[in-house]
Amino acid sequence: MNACNSQMLGCFVPGHHCIDNAIHSFAGLQVRRDMLEIMNKQGHEEPNGQVKVSSGYNLPAKYIFHTVGPIYSGMHRDETDLASCYYSCLRKADEMKLDSIVFCSLSTGIFGFPIEKASRIAIKCVNSYLKEENKNIKKVIFDVFSDSDYETYRKNMKEFNY
């Protein structure tokens, strides 16, 4: 999953250390072209909590799921929007009959969502979806930014017996 901005065209800061920049850089220019076409057809910026899909191109993945997470403000709406991102991606993966999905730690970088809170939301959404709605997904991977993020996810996953 690519955590992206509302333009969905990749990070516009050269050399920026965000997941959006990394994915667009390594996947290739075709991703930006595809996303530009999708966004031109849509005619407006992408709101939080939805998902668009492109080919993975040069990445070792068939598809890239692009979603806009919330910029953290401390409001309850942030949590709802973050959950919507995860549920939208899970539903789309299931609809596409994919058996696995990889999530980054959405909104916890430059968007400022506290990792403790964000990881609980991510794990709760995945756990709920797999138990209640899932038809095809067999593997979910959380790809995190740092060792401390890893420890936070690991600790919080124990609450769900993972």
Give residue ranges: language-model regions:
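Macrodomain-like recognition of ADP-ribose-binding/processing modules
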Residues: 2-162
